[in-house]
Structure formats: C-alpha cells, structure tokens
C-alpha cells in the first residue's frame, strides 16, 4: 500500500481435510508461489498443533492501483523483491469457474445488505465474508470438502447481495 498498490483476489480454492474444533490451537502458513507484474498466486495452509494439514488453499490476485481501483502492473523493482516458495502439492483446479448448465432453475435465497461489519480496508466486502455468505446459503447439514470462489465485481457498503443456489450431482453452487 505504500506504493499506492494493492491486490484484489480473483479466485480462491480451499480443500478441507478436516474442520478444526472450536478453540483448537492452529497455525496458519502462507507464501507466494508464482508472481509476475500483473498477478500473484499464494498458498495457505491451516495446520493443527501436531503440524497436520486441516485445510490447504490457493488463490490468485491481481495488482491494482488503489487510486483508480483498476488493474495495473507493479514496477519491476517490486517484483524482484518478491520471494517465491515452491507451490504446495495439491489439486489445482482452474481459477475460472464455469457454472453448470442446469435443467432445473436456481433457487433464489434471502437478499442481504452489505453492512459495515463486512467491509475491508479497500471499502469492499471482505473476501472472507463472501465465504461466510456462501456457507450460510448451503442447505442445512450440507457436508463439503472443497470450496471454490470466484470474485467478480466487489460489493460495497450498502450493496444488495442476492444469492441463489443450485444443487447438482457435482455439488452445491451458490451465485
């Protein structure tokens, strides 16, 4: 941010090995495994006290000029300062989500207004809040082991979020 640059997430994939218990001691590790002047890719691991992986994630983010909120290239000198680590060994699905061509209609769910508690430092709904909204939209008791999120147009304070759901043989989709 000191250079007037930020990063907006474009997509995230989370593979869940097991859900931690409430109050369980956890360690979060994150690192960059790919980066160029336009975007960067990052792994994140959630580890239990024994060092076992509870969840593995990868995300891709695009660099933005914070004064215009538009995508930008970072200066080469900044790119040269980025330390890359090897990518975590996991299944990397394409970052672009293709919604299923479903014969049944999507179920419209209750609308939600983006309130102040959901807003991040860039004045948009925080990425984690989209996860919360999606989880809330799942059918009661729905068990999942993988989450994929595509971040499109960022919602701002006061925006009306209108989720819809489709359950197929491949899984449950929230849009």
Locate predicted features.
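Hot-dog-fold acyl-thioester-processing enzymes
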Residues: 1-9, 56-58, 65-145
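HotDog/MaoC-like acyl-thioester-processing domains
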Residues: 15-101, 151-160, 166-175
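Small beta-barrel nucleic-acid-binding modules, principally OB-folds
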Residues: 4-19, 142-154
